[in-house]
Regions:
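Short, small-residue-biased leader/transition segments that mark boundaries at the very start
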Residues: 2-6
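Short, well-structured secondary-structure segments
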Residues: 16-41, 48-51, 56-61, 113, ...
């Protein structure tokens, strides 16, 4: 059985998240959304939509901060601030960056989730076809694929092009989708 996880990061964003949810529902796929606490506070309706659609939620810090740029207490406080809203046991460090002490402390409170395929859908340097080709080229059984429900991914057209075509490609290859 070939399995794949779609991980969506940086939302919720009203311009993007509803579209992602509609697409996932159309394909009967559940995903894991790693959300930024500040975005949840700004867009509670979109947060509720994700939960009501049955997707899994993870902590992505309150302000999308890089661990290496903050002291341990400040980084941990930023992560814990999200817990006041979502109470998730999943954590993903923004940009995949955190120090060893941050990791060591957080692993007692969360399942820390990374990825093996970041689509780079947020990049202005990537054309939509390149984002799709990243999925086609690097997806493997058990992959955790990262897309972003962010304005960066949306405004450059990468998300709208690559996410539906990636889902269609992976289904045609026999993959099933699961949540983390």
């Amino acid at each position: 059985q070939r399995q794949m996880c779609i991980r969506d990061s940086d939302g919720p964003i009203p311009e993007v998240t509803p579209w992602v949810l509609e697409l996932l529902e159309k394909h009967n796929i559940k995903a894991t959304f790693f959300m930024v606490g500040d975005n949840i506070k700004k867009h509670p309706d979109e947060y509720r939509m994700v939960v009501e659609h049955g997707h899994r939620i993870g902590n992505h810090t309150f302000n999308h901060i890089r661990g290496f740029e903050y002291s341990n207490p400040d980084y941990l406080a930023n992560a814990q601030k999200v817990d006041e809203i979502i109470h998730s046991d999943l954590f993903r460090p923004p940009h995949g960056h955190m120090g060893f002490r941050q990791y060591y402390t957080l692993r007692y409170h969360y399942r820390i989730i990374m990825w093996d395929l970041v689509t780079r859908d947020y990049s202005k340097r990537m054309r939509p076809e390149q984002v799709l080709n990243n999925v086609k080229r690097y997806a493997r059984n058990g992959s955790i694929i990262t897309f972003h429900d962010s304005l960066k991914s949306w405004n450059n057209g990468n998300l709208q092009y690559a996410l539906p075509r990636s889902i269609e490609f992976l289904k045609a290859e026999g993959y099933e989708f699961k949540v983390l």
